Amino acid sequence: MASSRRLRALITNDDGIDSPGLWALADATRDAGFDVVVAAPHRDASGVGASVFAVRGEDGVAVHPRELPGLDGVPAYAVEGHPSFIVYASGRGWLEPKPDLVVSGINLGANVGRSVLHSGTVGAALTAGLQGWYGLAVSLDTGWTPPEHPHWEAATAGLPEVFDLLLSRDPGTVLSYNAPDVDPAALRELREAELAEFGTAQVVVEHREAGPGGATHGTLRSSLHEVGEQPSPTSDVGLLAAGHPTVTELRSVAAVPGVLGGVVVTSAH
């Protein structure tokens, strides 16, 4: 397996620079032997997927140096941009040396099912893969209402095993790792999981008409509703519910040959 001792890890997230989950992840990654640098959005950027949006002023995108709790000596930056923008910028001349891997999280809430497409945590890891780096998205299954004291250590406990798994594969590999929010002693064995067809909750959007004299056509209000279907026991949703940390390899955008089925297309005149 590849040695982690010479590798540089960029730690980011979509919950923002002030998330304790980010700090725990950076600390655990440093303990695993990586050269760590932290760069995360200056405020919450959940649900932005692989967006490369950034707030651009006259002089560019603002970067604020930060000192993070328990991370003395680790360079850290709050960036006024989305997680994938941070990853993209890191490979385009901002960070030297460039990262070898991007570790994104620890997200407050699981990233499961096909809805991982919309996760900023996962988007950062997928963007790393597109640049030929290793990518790892780390999430904690805290349920609908996050607890006051999440078990971040439940996610960090399995990181050495997941890092070994990741680094045994080719650069460009992206893994999504979810852990139940339990005491680490209660964790069951790590399992490979398929993506569920749905997550643990479904977003329902309601259109509310504007009142008399309103300047808009109304508002769209979204809310979460529990999914009634039972997940497959081999899916990420099912395995997490059974107390297993899960790992899933993700693939990003790629062309699929054969769309024309061998039909010869001639130019139209």
Model-found features: residue ranges?
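Electrostatically charged, flexible surface regions
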Residues: V48, P150-H269
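A cross-family phosphate/adenosyl-ligand binding-site feature
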Residues: A2-A9, S19, W23-G93, P97-K98
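Alpha-helix C-terminal capping segments
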Residues: S90-E96, G123-Y134
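Short beta-strand segments
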Residues: T12, A39-P41, S104-N107, A137-S139, ...
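Glycine/threonine-rich flexible loop motifs
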Residues: A110-S119
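Short, Asp-centered acidic motifs that coordinate Mg2+ and/or phosphate
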Residues: L101
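Glycine-rich phosphate/pyrophosphate-binding loops
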Residues: G129-A154
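Short glycine-rich anion-binding loops that position phosphate/pyrophosphate groups of nucleotides
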Residues: D15, D44, H82-P83, N107-A110, ...
